[in-house]
UniProtKB/Swiss-Prot annotation:
ATP binds at residues 792-800, 813, 1370-1378, 1391. Residues 786-1049, 1364-1615 form the Protein kinase domain. It comes from Acanthamoeba polyphaga mimivirus (APMV). It is a single-pass type I membrane protein. It catalyses: L-seryl-[protein] + ATP = O-phospho-L-seryl-[protein] + ADP + H(+); L-threonyl-[protein] + ATP = O-phospho-L-threonyl-[protein] + ADP + H(+). It is found in: Membrane. Coiled coil: none annotated. This is Putative serine/threonine-protein kinase/receptor R831.
């Protein structure tokens, strides 16, 4: 019966697939899949990780019992099965199945007696079969004791409680049943007799046996709760078990060996069947595999889908195939699977599996157009780097390191597309593959490497004899006489230290190469050790360090002082500490040979020309050639053959490939004439079905391209002028020239006639084009074509505006044109011409430009999510998944690699210049225009001549003469990687000068905490440190950065996915995986545009939908409190915000996102709840917590926050008065693309807001709608009826009365109580109908300011930006741009901050400081009028000073200032600074300089730009900063400082006013900083009055405590003025 059921089940499943796929897809690909409950966690994990890669689809997966899968007919794109289907069913239903991942089934038991024993029960196949037939029913059965003698007496005399399940043949239950049948003949017989059902077997009738759930997780839960139980589960479910009673059995396999479940044992089981797999037979099980190391209960999960179907749109199937290929090729997928005990296919099976992708056809055309190249080969750094760089949208290449001979073996069985060898090819392979071809690619040296700290930077010389004796243990110390004799110049430095020999303790090509070399050179070595892949040195040497990692020998050399071993030249170069591990020279025949490029080149040249090495004394003796091995004429797939040929040519001739090889120390085959001919001839002979596959084949002739006298274009030679012929092989002779003359004499007259006609036509066309206002430069536009919108940002060279061009949103960067010359216009034109030709997915697209002053601008694509800097600092995004961080870093490095490959260096790389589009793709911006920027810098003063210090490399800060700007960009990228790691600002709290000095002098870098190291991979931390290393040689290129980031979290083409559990501890994928495992319902992973990017973020954003309850929370009289006590109100608002959010979270509410034109945390909240009762309960608790909060004392002294008691002395009011209103209904929901926060809008929200404006502080009002839902749960008092917009009739409002706050009374309203004689109660419908509710003027007793929400914005110093008429730009500072303007008819100066995205805390502190500054009044400080607080127009408004700043006045040749007037100017400035220092609290200016001392038309001076220290610091991070000419040394050192820092600055200002010159003119940033630290000061003129000079010196004294106070400076200036007047 069961066999019939099983067959019927399989057929129905196949019908599901067969019927489900051939349906028309929707506009967006929606991928539906189902699978067994046991495979559910596997698919959820893969989908979660993959969704980071493919963002144009929606993956929906359900894990179901096998029979329930049948109900999903209309949806299925694929089915996930625990077991293969037969070849018969494949053919009948036109299906293809892909093995996805292996798993181990384990027998899991619960035995309390074994809880404290570190051992597992061991079982063999037959004994396990007996347990499942019932022949063995007790744990202490003799057969079990025999296999576990150490547990004799411990195993209990208890019945084995068996948990079984019959879920069908293609489930995990079916696999166990089949495996047991294979293990034990009696089980097979009884099982078949029972209709192939556990339930019908004899043991199932016993009370100890239970039929439990179909999923592995259900069975595991049963075991946990049942002592002495046994069942079968996936190892993935039990792997992390912490219950000491629970364990799993180890087993003897078919080969009789004891094995345990693991990645290796399952992969061994899969590999046992690789011959069948290679023959394209996937319809097989892997349990009870015959191999020595195979786990007997292994199985493979399969994806099954149709391979022939017809659809209008085939994209959905393409997505499924891309997903499958990604599982095979993505490193991150493999890592994540392994960590959760799902085992990726053995690498040798992946190529065979992936080739099945091409048999899936839609409309008789192969669905997949992408080529996947799978290759194996020797361990080498260049091939993976090449493949990473070569990978494109149509080609994905994957390389696996193994022995060279193993890779060629795989090629013979079609286990890879091509092999790579680094030690040649054994002759046997030429017999197995008759057309085997071997193409040389690049050579490298193998070198004796050592770690001897005492001789770092010096050269060590060894010879063969010494090296052999080191390996044989005859020389054990570095100061051995033989080594000293070879190194007389450094013999005194050689340490008395034991030589630690490092060798690979595994089979490796490097072992084979160096032992072969030593065996050839030394008969003793040949006899004792000989040529071998794994030398055993333990017999000869007691100081050996064995390495099990094929790439790990270099790491051991680094970690162990006085170590030695043969390693690759490129391996030494890749080590992070190159100075520590060095390469020894070799003495051969009295010649000392260094391991370098020249000796490698000579070695390869000698070999290729068959010259004996002995004839050339400068030849490195031990080298290896990397060669690609492939079938020359019998490739099975033409497209793959074409891709491989393209890769071959690319490695030899592409500049990117050449640079990569050269940087890593390789010698390219194409660099040698003989080898170049070999390469090209092999490329020409590479064929598929007798047709050459290389696009260059038709140009290759006698080992050259176009005989070296032409260029190959579109598979044909274009010859130089002196050559002709198909291959440019013929030289043009004189006779040919004569013939040519005759032909030309005939043709030219005819051609001239046609030429005249064409010229006329051309003139007409040019005329028409000219009148159509077009140019040859299609990127050139007229500025009038742009609709300029809001400001997006400001930089050192102009402003960026959001604009519209041709109906498209764009970003327009308007170049500052104040100093633009004609030469700059020309440079701008030429540079923009280059920039617009650049196209890369990770570089911001230059779309157009206007190149004429005064409107020079660049039009770029609009990046809607802003900068990476903004993202990392956005407090509304609580977590960013680690995988997403790596993805963003990878994309940025890819963009930078493209720029560097295009000959462009950035010079200002920082997180602010990495922008994100709507799909969260990172793109590099603000590069290029080097000449224009340089010219603009020359026009500026030394107050603004350097970029953002935080990201600048030390060699640039130090003004080094030879700067490699490519590596300087890498340094900047290191800081960006740190920002991604920590989400903090680099060097927070430090001034630019302090940063620069610390970076150069002290080698300071941003700190990496232990927590960060723990939470992220060590590879990522190492990459950061290498990028920002002070030694530029250590810094990697961006190509290497790409490769390393790719290795951290997957391939560059599929940059996605998970990492270790520790790496994900901060959230993201790891949590998503955990969550999905516990879910048995539908898992939907939406990959459209943005949602996938936030798998780790969205889980925090559970939001109410449908009909909801909206609550508005608002502080009344906030403006009065802000004006009364700004600091107290700042702290109170923070406290209030924290209380509201904490209680909201407790009751399941959601804080609606604030629209872009409003700021959060200003006093009003819009909260949304799914449950109305919870909403009201939260309001009650908020009121109680607000009543008992620890408010600032001064705030409580104001009537709007004072304590109030009722008649019984019960406290009813204290602190902020907060009103609350609630209403329910449907809402509109939108989502912010960056924060993923939801914003609620619509009439329900509007009505709630209106009700709130009618509510008193401390009162809670609900709408009629909400009242009708909850009137039986709370006590209400009816307030009255009011007219509400968006509501069809008058609405009745109700006040909620809570017992503890029932005596709160709100004047001005007549309450109608419907509980007769009681003081409180619940209104009911009968009373409502009685007509007692009265209309009221509810506003009668509410202050005018409280008739609006967020009354904090009604403070007198908060200005509406729309009321300001902005004029021209009049200044540009380190943190903002200054415009003149008019406000209410008054001339004002408007300083707009560069950083418009302030955090909630920053905005509150900004408000407090505004309130404080608005109270300052002095004739020598600029009057603060107010501020605008809504982005994108956050700014401060001050009085306008017509004469500009003191610097402008000093530089104006038309203004002659006498010394007396200079004293007057300085006296006024000193008075202003002294006033700031005397205020309470004291204001330290921090930036005293002439640019911040303004002058009016009457020559009165006023200090400007004081206050807002925190915002200035944040804005300075975003902008280019000036030199520290006026900065005190303690500030430069990064020490704590006081108001005396302003005194120092004023001393420099005094000198500047005295001389009219700029301090430290022509000095760069670093020189100024160091000069100030070392006591350097501007030279005081000899004719300076003595007392004045004395005061200057006192002011700029190096020690702060020896400087005068500003009060003393004022007094001294007054005395000097009096003395001068007296003399005059």
């Amino acid at each position: 019966m069961h066999s019939v059921y099983t067959k019927y089940t399989i057929i129905l499943i196949l019908l599901v697939i067969y019927q489900g796929l051939p349906t028309n897809t929707q506009v967006a690909s929606r991928i539906f899949g189902v699978g067994s409950k046991s495979s559910g966690p596997l698919y959820r994990q893969l989908i979660d990780i993959y969704s980071y890669t493919y963002d144009n689809a929606v993956f929906i997966f359900e894990d179901l019992p096998i029979d329930v899968i049948l109900t999903q007919v209309d949806y299925i794109d694929y089915v996930g099965l625990d077991r293969c289907i037969s070849h018969e069913y494949e053919e009948i239903f036109n299906l293809v199945q892909f093995p996805l991942a292996g798993q181990a089934i384990v027998m899991t038991y619960n035995i309390p007696e074994l809880a404290n024993l570190d051992t597992r029960i061991v079982i063999d196949r037959q004994t396990l079969g007996k347990i499942w037939t019932g022949e063995i029913s007790k744990w202490n059965h003799p057969d079990i004791i025999a296999l576990n003698p150490t547990l004799n007496g411990t195993l209990p005399d208890k019945e084995i409680k068996l948990g079984y399940n019959d879920d069908g043949n293609v489930s995990i239950s079916g696999i166990v049943q089949a495996a047991l049948s294979s293990f034990y003949g009696n089980f097979a017989t009884e099982f078949n007799n029972a209709g192939q059902l556990f339930a019908n077997m004899s043991f199932a009738n016993e009370s100890r046996c239970v039929n439990i759930g179909p999923s592995s997780r259900e069975r595991f839960d049963w075991v946990k709760n049942t002592t002495y139980s046994l069942t079968f589960v996936n190892y993935a479910d039990v792997f992390n078990n912490t219950n000491p009673n629970i364990s799993v059995m180890n087993m003897y396999n078919k080969a009789g060996n004891l094995v345990e479940p693991s990645l290796e044992s399952v992969q061994f089981a899969m590999a046992d069947f690789k011959d069948e797999y290679s023959n394209n037979n996937f319809a097989l099980d892997v349990f009870d595999a015959p191999g020595n190391n195979s786990w007997p209960l292994s199985y493979v999960n399969y994806i099954v889908m149709s391979k022939r179907f017809f659809q209008l749109d085939c994209s959905r199937a393409d997505v499924v195939l891309k997903f499958i290929a990604w599982v095979y090729t993505n490193t991150a997928a493999s890592k994540a699977l392994t960590q959760n005990q799902f085992y990726p296919l053995d690498n040798t099976l992946k190529k065979v599996s992936i080739d099945n992708i091409y048999i899936v056809k839609c409309n008789n055309v192969s669905v997949s157009e992408q080529q996947y190249l799978i290759s194996f080969g020797g361990s080498t750094s260049i091939v993976p780097s090449w493949l990473t760089a070569f990978t494109s949208g149509s080609i994905v290449a994957k390389y696996y390191s193994t022995l060279s001979s193993n890779s060629i073996e795989l090629l013979t069985t079609h286990g890879c597309d091509f092999a790579v060898t680094i030690n040649g090819v054994d002759q046997k392979f030429y017999q197995e593959i008759e057309d085997l071809a071997v193409m040389p690619l690049a050579a490298f040296s193998i070198v004796p490497a050592y770690n001897i700290p005492e001789i770092v930077g010096k050269t060590l010389v060894l010879d063969i004899d010494v090296i052999v004796k080191i390996y044989l243990g005859e020389i054990t110390n570095w100061n051995d006489t033989k080594i000293r004799n070879l190194n007389p110049e450094i013999s005194n430095y050689l340490p008395n230290a034991i030589i630690n020999v490092v060798v690979q303790n595994i089979e490796s090509d490097i072992n084979q190469i160096f032992t072969k070399f030593l065996s050839q050179e030394s008969e003793i070595f040949s006899q004792e050790i000989g040529q071998t892949y794994n030398p055993d040195l333990s017999l000869f040497n007691s100081s050996v360090i064995f390495v099990d990692d094929i790439d790990g020998l270099g790491d051991e050399l680094i970690d162990n002082k006085y170590s030695f071993g043969f390693w690759t030249d490129f391996g030494v170069r890749l080590l992070s500490r190159v100075q520590t591990v060095q390469m020894a020279s070799l003495k051969i025949n009295d010649d000392i040979i260094e391991p370098n490029y020249d000796t490698l080149k000579n070695a390869i040249s000698s070999e290729s020309n068959q010259i004996a090495r002995s004839t050339n004394s400068n030849v490195w003796p031990i080298t290896s050639m990397i060669s690609i091995v492939y079938p020359e004429t019998t490739m099975k797939n033409k497209d793959k053959a074409v891709a491989i040929a393209e890769f071959m040519y690319w490695t030899q001739y592409d500049p990117l490939a050449i640079n990569s090889a050269n940087n890593k120390g390789y010698y390219l085959a194409s660099s040698d004439p003989q080898l170049r001919s070999v390469v090209l001839d092999l490329l020409k002979n590479f064929k598929f079905e007798d047709e050459s596959v290389s696009s260059y084949a038709n140009c290759i002739y006698q080992g050259s391209i176009c005989s070296n006298f032409g260029t190959c274009i579109e598979s044909a030679c274009i010859c130089n002028s002196s050559r002709t012929g198909t291959y440019c092989e013929k030289i043009i002779t004189d006779s040919e020239n004569n013939t040519l003359i005759i032909i030309l004499a005939t043709v030219i007259p005819i051609a001239c006639i046609f030429g005249l006609l064409l010229l006329t036509l051309l003139i007409v066309i040019i005329f028409l084009l000219k009148h159509r206002n077009t140019t040859n430069n299609d990127w050139e536009i007229d500025f009038s074509e742009l609709e300029i919108g809001e400001t997006l940002g400001t930089g050192g060279y102009g402003e960026v505006y959001k604009s519209i061009w041709k109906g498209t949103e764009v970003a327009v960067k308007l170049i500052s044109s104040k100093h633009v010359s004609k030469d700059m216009e020309r440079s701008f034109f030429e540079e923009v011409k280059i920039m617009t030709s650049l196209r890369h997915p990770n570089v911001v697209l230059f779309m157009a430009a206007s190149t004429k002053s005064p409107n020079m601008c660049i039009v770029m694509e609009f990046m809607s999510l802003g900068s990476l800097y903004d993202l990392l600092g956005n407090e509304l995004i609580p977590e960013i998944p680690y995988a997403l961080k790596i993805k963003m870093a990878y994309q940025a490095s890819k963009g930078m690699h493209f720029l560097h490959s295009s000959g462009i260096v950035h010079r200002d790389l920082k997180s602010l210049n990495l922008l994100l589009d709507s799909k969260w793709n990172v793109k590099v911006s603000d590069f290029g225009l080097t000449k224009v920027k340089s010219e603009l810098d020359k026009k500026k003063t030394n107050d603004n001549i350097i970029g953002t210090i935080h990201w600048i490399a030390p060699e640039i800060l130090n003004d080094s003469t030879e700067v490699d700007y490519i590596l300087a960009d890498v340094y900047s990228f290191g800081i960006i990687l740190w920002e991604l790691l920590t989400r903090e600002q680099p060097y927070k709290g430090m001034t630019p000068a302090a940063i620069a000095v610390s970076v150069i002098r002290d080698g300071m870098r941003p700190p990496i905490s232990d927590e960060a190291v723990t939470a992220h991979s060590i590879e990522y931390i190492d990459l950061i440190k290498q990028c920002w290393h002070s030694d530029t040689i250590i810094r990697p290129t961006f190509l290497e950065i790409m490769t390393r980031l790719s290795n951290i979290l997957g391939d560059s083409s599929n940059m996605t996915s998970g990492t270790s559990s520790s790496s994900l501890s901060s959230g993201g994928i790891g949590k998503s995986i955990t969550d999905s495992k516990s879910s048995n319902s539908r898992s939907s992973v939406e990959s459209s545009n943005t949602s996938n990017t936030f798998r780790g973020i969205d889980r925090h954003n559970s939001h109410p939908t449908g009909e909801v309850t909206v609550a508005f929370i608002d502080i009344i009289s906030a403006s009065k409190l802000w004006e009364y006590d700004p600091d107290g109100m700042c702290e109170s608002t923070k406290m209030y915000n924290e209380i509201i959010r904490r209680v909201t979270k407790k009751y399941g509410g959601y804080e609606s996102f604030i629209s872009k034109d409003r700021n959060s945390g200003e006093g009003s909240f819009c909260l949304v709840f799914s449950d109305a009762i919870q909403a009201i309960n939260s309001c009650e608790e908020m009121q109680l917590q607000l009543l008992n909060a620890n408010w600032p004392k001064k705030i409580l002294q104001h009537p709007a926050a004072a304590e109030e008691f009722d008649r019984t002395d019960q406290l009813i009011f204290r602190g902020l008065r907060v009103r609350m209103a609630l209403h329910c209904g449907s809402v509109k929901i939108s989502q912010d693309p960056m924060t993923r926060k939801y914003q609620y809008s619509g009439s329900t929200v509007n009505i709630t807001g209106k009700i709130t404006t009618l509510t008193h502080g401390g009162q809670i009002i609900v709408s009629e709608n909400l009242y009708q839902k909850v009137n039986n749960d709370f006590t209400f008092i009816t307030v009255g009826k009011i007219d509400i917009p968006d509501y069809p009739s008058k609405m009745t409002l109700y006040e909620i009365k809570f017992e503890i706050l029932k005596n709160r009374f709100f004047g001005g309203i007549t309450y109608v109580n419907y509980n007769d004689d009681t003081d409180s109660g619940t209104a009911d419908d009968s009373n409502y109908d009685s007509g007692k509710i009265i209309d009221i003027d509810y506003m009668a007793d509410i202050d005018k300011e409280d008739s609006f929400l967020t009354s904090a914005n009604m403070c007198r110093w908060i200005i509406n930006y729309d009321e300001i008429s902005i004029g021209k730009q009049i200044g540009l500072g380190s943190y903002g741009i200054v415009f003149n303007g008019k406000w209410k008819g008054v001339d004002v100066a408007v300083k707009k901050f560069v950083k418009q995205k302030l955090s909630e805390t920053q905005l509150l502190e900004f408000r407090a400081e505004m309130a404080f500054l608005s109270e300052l009044k002095h004739s020598n400080i600029v009057t603060f009028i107010g501020a605008c607080i809504k982005k994108p127009n956050i700014c401060i408004v001050t009085e306008y000073m017509r004469m500009g700043n003191l610097r402008d006045v000093l530089k104006n040749p038309d203004i002659k200032i006498t010394f007396a007037n200079k004293l007057k100017l300085l006296y006024g400035a000193a008075m202003g600074i002294d006033y700031l220092h005397s205020s309470n609290p004291m204001i330290v200016h921090r930036d005293i300089k002439p640019a911040n001392i303004l002058v009016d038309e009457h020559f009165n001076v006023k200090i400007a730009d004081f206050g807002f220290a925190r915002i200035k610091e944040d804005n300075t991070t975003m902008t280019r900063c000036g030199t520290p000419c006026w900065t005190a040394p303690e500030v430069i050192r990064g020490e704590k400082y006081c108001e005396k820092a302003d005194v120092f600055s004023f001393g420099v200002v005094m000198w500047e006013v005295l001389t009219g010159k700029e301090p430290f003119a022509e000095c760069n940033f670093m020189k100024v900083s160091l000069d100030i630290l070392e006591g350097g000061r501007p030279i005081i003129p000899s004719d300076c009055p003595h007392e004045f000079a004395k005061l200057i010196k006192k002011c700029w004294h190096a020690k702060a405590h020896k400087r005068p106070t500003m009060t003393e400076v004022v007094q001294q200036l007054m005395l000097i003025t009096e003395q001068f007047d007296h003399k005059v």
